[in-house]
Design a protein with these regions (language model features):
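Interfacial helix-cap and linker-helix signal at transmembrane-aqueous boundaries
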Residues: 34-35, 66-67, 152-157, 226-227, ...
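Helix-loop junctions at membrane interfaces in 12-TM secondary transporters
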Residues: 90-101, 284-294
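Short amphipathic helix-loop junctions that connect adjacent transmembrane helices
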Residues: 29-43, 220-236
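Structural signature of the two symmetry-related core transmembrane helices
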Residues: 73-87, 266-281
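Conserved MFS/SLC helix-loop-helix module at the cytosolic interface between two early adjacent transmembrane helices
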Residues: 58-93
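Symmetry-related core transmembrane helices of the 12-TM Major Facilitator Superfamily/SLC fold
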Residues: 161-178, 357-373
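Intracellular juxtamembrane helix-capping segments at the cytosolic ends
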Residues: 110-125, 304-317
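Helix-to-loop junctions at the C-terminal end of transmembrane segments
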Residues: 57-71, 154, 251-263, 348-349
Length: 385
């Protein structure tokens, strides 16, 4: 159980998980309106998201240097920047302006993502308490509330920039909590060495890549699928990312209980299969009800894919190599978090938006039948590092 002392100790990074959930939840619900405003095809919109993804990955690479320079002010500065920069894409009227503006906004959130996860890891290390699943559940709950609220506001006629202005005001209060950061920089870790360690990092990174790709692609395209493919309105479309966020929060809160009874690899394989079934249902649905059910099942399953992979990698490397191993896995995995939406756009352009969710389900089954067994086989050969 999470205690009040745990929350108090982690309040600074937890406020940043709230910030990211609010920003990306609002963005997901605004995708149909933004896409219509800049008047582009699925493929061009996907290309805009890809441009933003490249900037985000670069920002993740630069985040440790920024953290070393700003120290305890890093999270507050990045949270403030992210809240302000998300106003700009809502003002764009064409793809030439939208792509670079979204790049800057996404870059701020990417750097913040790295730092806040490092801070949560530091709190875990100091207190000896697991907090990562709870932190990601906070993100999911904020994402769900924000997506639903933004959809309702869009139904009432609010333009995207007005919605993001409201989120920015809420974010100002959260920045005050981020200023409570008292963490010290993490010590450098030794590099994980040997073929076993490299194989573990590669396999774990691929699992996280697919999991994040499915998660963020659904966040970015579910509202459009519900509205364009199935004829839903703005509020009905916003329920897609909202349902995903809510079920992911439930999945993450309950995931730890499953790990006490089953191995990480077993939970990982079953969760990936469950999320694949949800993706198939959502993609092939002919009505809103089945699509909602599909997104709910997808959210429950995919919510624990990345945490299980992170946990498995961290448990199977030596103490001195753990930080470096998690950093490398993150760089592989988070690329999936950002390439998912543009890949969905390209696939949608080629074969249709519904079938792009079916293709996503196939990728998730690759975890169940290929990557999870390979991780289990490597686990049997002993610890790496």
């Amino acid at each position: 159980m999470i205690s009040r002392d745990d929350i108090r100790a982690a309040r600074a990074p937890l406020s940043c998980f709230l910030t990211l959930g609010l920003l990306w939840g609002a963005f997901a619900a605004q995708v149909p309106g933004i896409k219509a405003r800049i008047a582009v095809s699925d493929g061009v919109f996907g290309l805009c998201l890809l441009v933003a993804a490249m900037g985000t990955i670069l920002a993740m690479w630069l985040a440790p240097r920024l953290d070393a320079r700003l120290g305890q002010r890093t999270m507050a500065a990045l949270a403030l920047a992210a809240g302000g920069l998300f106003l700009l894409p809502g003002l764009a009227t064409g793809p030439i302006g939208f792509a670079p503006l979204l790049l800057f906004a996404a870059a701020a959130t990417g750097a913040l993502d790295v730092v806040m996860n490092a801070r949560i890891s530091g709190v875990e290390a100091r207190r000896g308490r697991p907090l990562m699943n709870f932190a990601h559940a906070v993100f999911s709950m904020a994402y769900a509330v924000s997506a639903l609220t933004a959809g309702l506001l869009r139904e009432l006629g609010w333009p995207p920039v007005a919605v993001f202005a409201l989120i920015a005001l809420v974010n100002l209060a959260l920045v005050r909590l981020a200023l409570a950061d008292r963490a010290q920089p993490l010590d450098d870790a030794a590099d994980p060495r040997g073929a076993a360690a490299r194989g573990l990092i590669l396999l774990g990174g691929l699992v996280i890549l697919i999991g994040f790709m499915a998660e963020n692609a659904t966040e970015g395209w579910s509202a459009l699928h519900l509205e364009r493919s199935l004829g839903g309105g703005a509020t009905e479309g916003a329920l897609g990312p909202a349902i995903l966020g809510a079920t992911m929060a439930l999945g993450r809160l309950g995931g730890q209980a499953l790990v006490t009874r089953y191995s990480e690899i077993t939970v990982l394989a079953l969760a990936a299969a469950l999320s694949a079934m949800g993706a198939f249902a959502a993609g092939l649905a002919e009505g809103l009800a089945l699509a909602y059910a599909g997104f709910a099942v997808l959210g429950l399953g995919v919510s624990v894919v990345a945490p299980m992979a992170f946990s498995h990698v961290g448990r199977n490397v030596g103490n001195r190599a753990r930080t470096a191993a998690i950093a490398r896995v993150s760089m592989i995995g988070y690329s999936g978090f950002f390439i998912g939406p543009p890949v969905m756009g390209f696939v949608s352009e080629a074969i249709g938006l519904g079938w792009s969710f079916v293709a996503m389900g196939g990728a998730l089954l690759f975890i169940t039948f290929i990557l999870a067994p390979l991780l289990a086989a490597q686990d049997r050969r002993g610890h790496a590092g």
